[in-house]
Design a protein with these regions (language model features):
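Non-catalytic terminal/accessory regions
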Residues: 1-175
Length: 175
């Protein structure tokens, strides 16, 4: 998220602040970065419901598309071209709908940036042979709908306390 600022002083100050937070929390900067990945109010099943007033629009993060996308569904489950505009026919709350549409546009942009950044972070983790405790791994890669992209696309290995390989595995798209 630091890439959102053009002013290098803001980037540096943000970076230094995050380093301090990690140090004070007794964790590495990479561990803090894992924790800070937002879920954008989407559930573990990658869905979120937008309340338009009398109707509800369901949205789902499609992590398997390139780039990752958000697919909208009407109440019957029909795929929509995007989050629909407010409609008087359905008595939609126009202000809420417009806010949702802006939010989804922002989320799509953020997900793209997160995936790019996390791809680099995970490549570094691979070279450094970084390890996650099972509980933390589940929190980061299974429960966070944005990070599920990596859970399903990578082959993971489980090791014992001594680093001995127990098994390799791959997560399925349904978590």
């Amino acid at each position: 998220f630091l890439n959102n600022y053009k002013d290098k002083r803001i980037k540096m100050a943000s970076d230094q602040t995050l380093d301090i937070i990690a140090r004070n929390g007794g964790i590495t900067r990479d561990e803090l970065n894992d924790i800070l990945i937002p879920n954008f109010e989407f559930g573990q099943d990658r869905t979120r419901t937008f309340d338009y007033g009398e109707r509800k629009i369901k949205a789902k993060i499609d992590i398997m598309s390139t780039p990752a996308n958000i697919i909208a569904y009407d109440e019957e489950g029909k795929i929509l071209k995007g989050l629909p505009k407010a409609s008087k026919k359905f008595n939609d709350v126009e202000s809420a709908v417009e806010e949702y549409r802006r939010e989804v546009k922002y989320i799509k942009k953020q997900i793209k940036e997160i995936i790019t950044e996390q791809s680099s972070n995970l490549l570094r983790a691979l070279f450094l042979e970084r390890k996650w405790k099972t509980k933390r791994w589940i929190e980061i890669f299974i429960k966070n709908p944005v990070m599920q992209e990596f859970a399903v696309q990578l082959i993971w290995k489980e090791t014992d306390e001594n680093g001995k390989l127990i098994k390799t595995f791959r997560c399925m798209d349904n978590g």
